[in-house]
Amino acid sequence: MNKKLNYEKKGPKAVILFHAFTGTPLDVNTVGKALGRENYTVLMPTLDGHDEEDPNEILKCGIKDWVKNGEEAYQTLKADGYTDISVFGLSLGGVIATHLMLNEDVKSYGVFSSPVISTSKTNVPKIFWQWYAFKMKKLGAKEADIQSKQSAVMNR
């Protein structure tokens, strides 16, 4: 399990909330707080490569890593004795929640703005590279270096 785990133990019903691609648990924090007020145990893991100062960390990870983070979060709750577990996710987090719904004994699940299969182009790559450039410029990277990294990744 990654080191960044927001876990508030309350009642016997547990919910795992997964954040979006390039996001953090802050993406789902409002929902988590509301559930906590209703006596739900809430676990909001930070997916590998996310919430890092260096945006290159996210490029070291992929869907298999994030699904593994989801499975580890689920197993954390099971190991702590929870049997009534629900999973919800935003965007990428919804993909992880869906994986858990299909492969684990979850009570309920939900997705918010999750990716679907599309035959047309999406804006996800464009938005990602805008985010990446913004983060790298904050670290002092030059535009040429950012473009070089983008080309290297896109041509893998």
Model-derived regions, located:
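Residue in the alpha/beta-hydrolase core beta-strand immediately N-terminal to the catalytic nucleophile
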Residues: 86, 108-110
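Gly/Ala-rich beta-loop-alpha elbow adjacent to hydrolase catalytic centers
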Residues: 88-93, 97
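The serine-hydrolase catalytic nucleophile loop
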Residues: 22-32
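The conserved beta1-alpha1 loop
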Residues: 16-22
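Catalytic nucleophile-loop/oxyanion-hole region of alpha/beta-hydrolase
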Residues: 53-84
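Conserved alpha/beta-hydrolase
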Residues: 35-54
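Short beta-strand-to-loop junctions in surface cap/lid or active-site-entrance loops
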Residues: 1-13
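The alpha/beta-hydrolase serine catalytic core
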Residues: 113-156
